[in-house]
Amino acid sequence: MSPQTETKTGFGFKAGVKDYRLNYYTPEYDTKDTDILAAFRMTPQPGVPPEEAGAAVAAESSTGTWTTVWTDGLTSLDRYKGRCYDIEPVAGEENQYIAYVAYPLDLFEEGSVTNMFTSIVGNVFGFKALRALRLEDLRIPPAYSKTFQGPPHGIQAERDKLNKYGRPLLGCTIKPKLGLSAKNYGRAVYECLRGGLDFTKDDENVNSQPFMRWRDRFLFVAEALFKSQAETGEVKGHYLNATAGTCEEMMKRAIFARELGAPIVMHDYLTGGFTANTSLAHYCRDNGLLLHIHRAMHAVIDRQRNHGMHFRVLAKALRMSGGDHVHAGTVVGKLEGEREVTLGFVDSLRDDYIEKDRSRGIYFTQDWVSMPGVFPVASGGIHVWHMPALTEIFGDDSVLQFGGGTLGHPWGNAPGAVANRVASEACVQARNEGRDLAREGNEIIREASKWSPELAAACEVWKEIKFEFETIDTL
């Protein structure tokens, strides 16, 4: 920034432009337990010192603006300003730094992810003094997290509702994602559920299009749910996508799902927005509905490692806003996700207390206190050969979702569901017997396929399918 230039008036107010670091770079600051802490990866413009860039981030995302204003004298900036309290260079990267910023809790409205993000990831991301800026992590203090309801029900309450324990839950996204009539859509749902899956799912862009209006879809899916439940004796669910063009329409769809007796609805939380998502989560808790969350649009925000926001931040925000499931990548499938980084934010979704661990991208210790956990959903390009790795990576408290890996079975949807259920139970049994899923996974699947012709057929179809590309977003 420009050097300090000031004009003193007769009232003691000094007008002009000051370096941000004079007020907002405070390396001597001791963070408070009530502060929201942020870790930004910043790339300053040539000639901008990192201290000035870090201070600019703190200022522009809290109380500061580009020039001194006389109304600063009407409040206590020391109480309300953000502070850049530490800066460290990023190893192996030229002119990149991690800037740590502390925000006083009074800057944020209680229970509002929308307000929190409007400040922390608002206009500052277009600031000219920075070539790029990325929010890597947030520490949400209990004093703030306790103002949020969080997930409508959480992991344990969902297991109790479903009466399903000791294994990952299995799901399937109905394909083709667009173009089916409501009746044929319901037929596909029924076949998958009677074959052994716990859930089926609307794709994220299935809302209410001319080929299949939402009310028709809900009715045929409800029929499929009740029929499959009667035949299998298991609780079944289908993620009925309530996402709509207005909050009022979204709520109308959720209310209709509840009236039909559906156990779960779905929302696209990034395209739908955090305000809509929090409203829906509150309704779901009050009315006994589970809430599945899809993260459509996340890669627009989180995929570039130098600019935007890491998904671990979006995951924490979702836990606060509310959702019982959220898509979290697969590590082994077709979508982006490095193993240790993925497990870092999976822990942030499920666990009560997460220790700082930079090797997994966790910049701050996070204490969620009593906020319920969220099921991570692994979905995208996975099939039966991935089952051992998925079981080993994600454990029991997860939802493994096979779309093409169910509906692409050569014998149809129900045999595809059977193949996935057999593979999952074989992996869980082998793990419980002490076998090493990472080393013996293929052997475990081959053994199970000897007594399951459906699994054997699936193994043959997908034996050569791999998605081996280098991960873009790495530590």
Curated annotation (Swiss-Prot):
<dbReference type="InterPro" id="IPR036376">
    <property type="entry name" value="RuBisCO_lsu_C_sf"/>
</dbReference>
<feature type="binding site">
    <location>
        <position position="327"/>
    </location>
    <ligand>
        <name>substrate</name>
    </ligand>
</feature>
<keyword id="KW-0479">Metal-binding</keyword>
<dbReference type="InterPro" id="IPR020878">
    <property type="entry name" value="RuBisCo_large_chain_AS"/>
</dbReference>
<dbReference type="GO" id="GO:0016984">
    <property type="term" value="F:ribulose-bisphosphate carboxylase activity"/>
</dbReference>
<feature type="propeptide">
    <location>
        <begin position="1"/>
        <end position="2"/>
    </location>
</feature>
<keyword id="KW-0113">Calvin cycle</keyword>
<keyword id="KW-0602">Photosynthesis</keyword>
<dbReference type="Pfam" id="PF00016">
    <property type="entry name" value="RuBisCO_large"/>
</dbReference>
<keyword id="KW-0934">Plastid</keyword>
<feature type="modified residue" description="N6-carboxylysine">
    <location>
        <position position="201"/>
    </location>
</feature>
<keyword id="KW-0456">Lyase</keyword>
<dbReference type="GO" id="GO:0004497">
    <property type="term" value="F:monooxygenase activity"/>
</dbReference>
<feature type="site" description="Transition state stabilizer">
    <location>
        <position position="334"/>
    </location>
</feature>
<keyword id="KW-0007">Acetylation</keyword>
<dbReference type="InterPro" id="IPR000685">
    <property type="entry name" value="RuBisCO_lsu_C"/>
</dbReference>
<feature type="binding site">
    <location>
        <position position="295"/>
    </location>
    <ligand>
        <name>substrate</name>
    </ligand>
</feature>
<feature type="binding site">
    <location>
        <position position="204"/>
    </location>
    <ligand>
        <name>Mg(2+)</name>
    </ligand>
</feature>
<keyword id="KW-0601">Photorespiration</keyword>
<protein>
    <recommendedName>
        <fullName>Ribulose bisphosphate carboxylase large chain</fullName>
        <ecNumber>4.1.1.39</ecNumber>
    </recommendedName>
</protein>
<dbReference type="GO" id="GO:0019253">
    <property type="term" value="P:reductive pentose-phosphate cycle"/>
</dbReference>
<keyword id="KW-0150">Chloroplast</keyword>
<feature type="binding site">
    <location>
        <position position="173"/>
    </location>
    <ligand>
        <name>substrate</name>
    </ligand>
</feature>
<feature type="binding site">
    <location>
        <position position="203"/>
    </location>
    <ligand>
        <name>Mg(2+)</name>
    </ligand>
</feature>
<dbReference type="GO" id="GO:0009507">
    <property type="term" value="C:chloroplast"/>
</dbReference>
<feature type="active site" description="Proton acceptor">
    <location>
        <position position="294"/>
    </location>
</feature>
<dbReference type="InterPro" id="IPR017443">
    <property type="entry name" value="RuBisCO_lsu_fd_N"/>
</dbReference>
<feature type="modified residue" description="N-acetylproline">
    <location>
        <position position="3"/>
    </location>
</feature>
<keyword id="KW-1015">Disulfide bond</keyword>
<comment type="similarity">
    <text>Belongs to the RuBisCO large chain family. Type I subfamily.</text>
</comment>
<dbReference type="InterPro" id="IPR036422">
    <property type="entry name" value="RuBisCO_lsu_N_sf"/>
</dbReference>
<feature type="binding site" description="in homodimeric partner">
    <location>
        <position position="123"/>
    </location>
    <ligand>
        <name>substrate</name>
    </ligand>
</feature>
<dbReference type="Pfam" id="PF02788">
    <property type="entry name" value="RuBisCO_large_N"/>
</dbReference>
<comment type="function">
    <text>RuBisCO catalyzes two reactions: the carboxylation of D-ribulose 1,5-bisphosphate, the primary event in carbon dioxide fixation, as well as the oxidative fragmentation of the pentose substrate in the photorespiration process. Both reactions occur simultaneously and in competition at the same active site.</text>
</comment>
<feature type="modified residue" description="N6,N6,N6-trimethyllysine">
    <location>
        <position position="14"/>
    </location>
</feature>
<dbReference type="GO" id="GO:0000287">
    <property type="term" value="F:magnesium ion binding"/>
</dbReference>
<keyword id="KW-0460">Magnesium</keyword>
<feature type="binding site">
    <location>
        <position position="379"/>
    </location>
    <ligand>
        <name>substrate</name>
    </ligand>
</feature>
<feature type="binding site" description="via carbamate group">
    <location>
        <position position="201"/>
    </location>
    <ligand>
        <name>Mg(2+)</name>
    </ligand>
</feature>
<keyword id="KW-0560">Oxidoreductase</keyword>
<dbReference type="InterPro" id="IPR033966">
    <property type="entry name" value="RuBisCO"/>
</dbReference>
<keyword id="KW-0503">Monooxygenase</keyword>
